[in-house]
């Protein structure tokens, strides 16, 4: 469960290492985000040569959560960290980076993030 002030690892090569959640989108009083949800984030830690800098406010999609998710077939999928991928805008869901590190959840394909799924090395 991702909420306001949660720190997330960044699973792409944009240059950001860690971001903090500012807002969970899609709902006026929505509190929690899970895999496949879009959040507004602020870059907390970044490498100097990256395309994003510390303090920038961006959109990101959640790709891994420690909380996990219950699937319809009864399986439960949880990851070792909370991670996101930075996207260009809310309309086309295109990732800003060209590589995605680590596994991502299969639920992203169902929610329309096909470009993120195609860049990922492993889909669980």
Curated annotation (Swiss-Prot):
Note the InterPro entries from the entry.
Ribosomal_uL14, Ribosomal_uL14_bac-type, Ribosomal_uL14_CS, Ribosomal_uL14_sf
GO CC terms, sorted: cytosolic large ribosomal subunit
Q: Which SUPFAM superfamilies match?
A: Ribosomal protein L14
On whether RNA-binding is a keyword of this UniProt record, the answer is: yes
Keyword Transcription regulation found: no
Q: Which UniProt keywords apply?
A: Ribonucleoprotein, Ribosomal protein, RNA-binding, rRNA-binding
Q: Where are the transmembrane segments?
A: none
Coiled-coil intervals: none
Q: Which domain of life is it from?
A: Bacteria
Kindly give the PROSITE patterns that the UniProt entry links to this protein. Answer: RIBOSOMAL_L14 (PS00049)
Q: Which Gene3D superfamilies match?
A: Ribosomal protein L14
**What are the recorded Gene Ontology BP terms?**
translation
Q: Which CDD domains match?
A: Ribosomal_uL14
Molecular function GO labels: large ribosomal subunit rRNA binding; structural constituent of ribosome
Concerning its family, UniProt says: Belongs to the universal ribosomal protein uL14 family.
Q: Which PANTHER family match?
A: 50S/60S RIBOSOMAL PROTEIN L14/L23, LARGE RIBOSOMAL SUBUNIT PROTEIN UL14M
What is the protein's known function? Binds to 23S rRNA. Forms part of two intersubunit bridges in the 70S ribosome.
Subunit and interaction comment: Part of the 50S ribosomal subunit. Forms a cluster with proteins L3 and L19. In the 70S ribosome, L14 and L19 interact and together make contacts with the 16S rRNA in bridges B5 and B8.
Query: What is the official name of this protein in its record?
Result: Large ribosomal subunit protein uL14
**Organism expressing this protein natively:** Mycoplasmoides gallisepticum (strain R(low / passage 15 / clone 2))
Give the source lineage, highest ranks first: Bacteria, Bacillati, Mycoplasmatota, Mycoplasmoidales, Mycoplasmoidaceae
Quote the gene name from the UniProt entry: rplN
